[in-house]
Amino acid sequence: MSSGHPSDNEEPRADLLREEEEEEEEEEDSDEDRGSTRPASPQATRECAGTQGSSRPEVTADGGTGSASGSGCRGSGACDSLFSWICRRKIRRGPYVDPARDHFRTMTRLYSSMSPAADSVNLSTQTHGAVFNLEYSPDGSVLTVACEQTEVLLFDPVSSRHIKTLVEAHEDCVNNIRFLDNRLFATCSDDTTIALWDLRKLNSKVCSLHGHASWVKNIEYDTHTRLLVTSGFDGNVITWDTNRFTEDGCPHKKFFHTRYLMRMRLTPDCSKMLISTSSGYLLILHDLDLTQSLEVGSYRILRARRPPLSTEGSSAGSRSGGPRHTIDNKNHPHREGLSPRNSLEVLTPEIPGERDRGNCITSLQLHPKGWATLLRCSSNMDDQEWTCVYEFQEGAPPRPPVSPRCSLRLTHYIEEANVGRGYIKELCFSPDGRLICSPYGYGVRLLAFDENCAELVDCMPVRTAQLREVRSIYSHSDVVLTSKFSPTHCQFASGCLSGRVALYQPHF
């Protein structure tokens, strides 16, 4: 003990007092709010008493023990700060315990090293035709391939082993595949039908669904209501009640209709439906209720409301999001009593370099956390293509104040290779939403929001920014039409016009 203590018989009591004070410091450190400035501990407050007015206070005497050096105070503060950080991590508070944040540097290195696997799947052009769509099962155990020549192929994506070929799965091109769960999946085709399949019994369809009058291009699934949702070039969005399907089909009804329909998607929480059109419009149904059919032909009452022009350049223009169409209840009083469910918003998304020219939204995807939408657009002259990311300005994590007039804001974009005209290129998000895989000529590009592959909410630009290229891989001999990330493995796949499917894995 130091000479400052009156006698040796008081040493145990002094030790107990110090231990109690240290325990109180630990409790206060563990209870502090995440992200706030850590308040000084009681001991530090006493040590720094009388010097609060100084920007860098020195430690004063404490209990007659004599003055300590300023470096001692700073060292104690550093130790306290380190202890507080460890304590917060231990009790799983703060951003330090998010696995995605902990491992994003590792994932960046992994995806930067992606290369075609030596045992990629090669398909015969004469037998299968072009690859139009790829889809993994939710558990990542099966990769399905939608082919031009009426067939669906199933592979083990880890070993590239062929599992099954669904010969004549349809009578025309197979356009899209969607898993309802780990065993049941649906396919759609230009033969205007949808087919349900069970992985446990692939010798025959579970059932065929008839209801569309033209090519069926898109399948979605509402996990809450177990409704299958399909869209086609007949302009119809149809819901199918899979709770009551039989060998003859299942009950269905027409939910929505619009002209020039290209793609339809549901947000991950199924609270919104997004529909893209070949005329450049993007339709958003908010507060979605799939059990209520919308009136066909009632959308002539929509009128355009263009936001005021801004003088802040492209940044402000991107915040406005372009023209917005809303229901004019003053001119149509019978619409005032409408339920707020399924409220419709019609947007003309801003496309870089295409302010005065039309465009076609050919591909549509949603961020896995519902924060943004991903569009592949082409000019009306079909001489330019872009990949664009639009942030949802409602329901997303808090961002700096933006214009409330539009629910989408262009945040990132990049120009694409203008090859394979007339074919739709399907792009996709990675499961964590940090990367985009985009068909690019005879290969694919991995794109990120910044050089660190950060999450969108962590690198939201004030002005519209270009997507960063993480890696380009050219492994096909023809135009790539589709790409897909595995939901469980560090792997993605791409398919091209000549019928080849390539698998990509990290190469060390």
Curated annotation (Swiss-Prot):
Chain positions of WD repeats: 126-165, 169-207, 211-250, 256-295, 356-396, 419-457, 475-508
Chain positions covered by the region annotation Disordered: 1-75, 307-343
First and last residue of the signal peptide: none
Listed Acidic residues bias regions: 18-32
A cellular component annotation (GO) from this entry: Cul4-RING E3 ubiquitin ligase complex
Biased composition range(s): Gly residues: 63-75
Superkingdom of origin: Eukaryota
A Pfam family recorded for this sequence: WD40
Family indicated by similarity: Belongs to the WD repeat DCAF10 family.
Described purpose of this protein according to its UniProt entry: May function as a substrate receptor for CUL4-DDB1 E3 ubiquitin-protein ligase complex.
Protein name as annotated: DDB1- and CUL4-associated factor 10
Originating organism: Danio rerio (Zebrafish)
Source taxonomy: Eukaryota, Metazoa, Chordata, Craniata, Vertebrata
Gene giving rise to this polypeptide: dcaf10
